[in-house]
Amino acid sequence: MRRCRRCARWPHRCPGPQSGPRSHFSPWPRTLGPAPALCVRTPLRPGPSSALGPLSACPSVPDYTASPPAGDSARSIVAASRAAGSGSTPGAGSKDCSPPPHSHSAAAAGESGDIGPGSGAVEAPGRGARRPTRQREDGGGAVGCFGVSRHRGREAQMSHSSHCGSRSCSAAAARPSLLQLA
């Protein structure tokens, strides 16, 4: 046994320059007991696993190569995350975002125009002749208003954010959009 200049541990075995590529991890000394279980990422190897990227050598570490859930399980996960996020921050989980004083009914109906059960469209009470307005939710559980993205100019954004307490509207009014900077 000799002392290695790289890792300065004594006593341990260190491969010499002839033994191939070295790792910065030195071998575990036998005097201290069994080697600890280290989870190290394995390099890409040719074969079917190379398409998935580097995989962990330790079975307890997830590789994160599974595809995201689809269908009903994805909807239940989204619903659970929205329910968990509501109520912790004032205004973050509220669904009381009223539309701006001016009408956005044409823009708020959405680009796809799908109206019906499960589409997310909400008809204004007592006004059957008007097109239904659509509400969408941002990732934090707050209802986002269509008005912020449809307004033009900083003054319109400020007037919109003054009536709306949702997190998405206040965040959008605080920073200028790319169209305004151009």
UniProtKB/Swiss-Prot annotation:
Compositional bias ranges of the Low complexity kind: 73-94, 159-182
Span list, region Disordered: 11-182
Protein name as annotated: Putative uncharacterized protein encoded by LINC00612
Organism listed in the record: Homo sapiens (Human)
